[in-house]
């Protein structure tokens, strides 16, 4: 299969995974923990869709490189992968999330609570997202070995 087809599948899988996962988890955090109204949360989630479409593949590449880097250092591959997913998710998503909340008119207190809550919850969410991303990549038949090769091109 040509590298372009692998790349397109990878982009599509990463985009589908990020849009679905961030919509569901973001709305839960915003409404349950950050005390945002349904309207504010829905506005935030709708604004996040085009943002997530733009950042999905760069995040996938960022995450894959962090996972590959940390896997070189550790003997516990499962634990290292989970730690890499946690770090990648929090470090990449928190600034993007804060910008989205600011853009929809959340006040500073709501932004701090939402981003802070999300960072704490991301200790679990980032790991779960890593598994969800791998599942979506599997559904789109993105081979594991080719993802590393494509990411380095």
From Swiss-Prot:
InterPro entries: Ala_export_AlaE. Keywords: Amino-acid transport, Cell inner membrane, Cell membrane, Membrane, Transmembrane, Transmembrane helix, Transport. The chain crosses the membrane at residues 16-36, 42-62, 86-106, 114-134. It is a multi-pass membrane protein. GO terms for molecular function: L-amino acid efflux transmembrane transporter activity. It comes from the Bacteria. GO terms for biological process: amino acid export across plasma membrane. Its main location: membrane. It holds the Pfam family AlaE. One of its GO terms (cellular component) is plasma membrane. It is found in: Cell inner membrane. Exports L-alanine. HAMAP family: L_Ala_exporter. Belongs to the AlaE exporter family. This is L-alanine exporter AlaE. The lineage of its organism: Bacteria, Pseudomonadati, Pseudomonadota, Gammaproteobacteria, Enterobacterales. The gene is alaE.
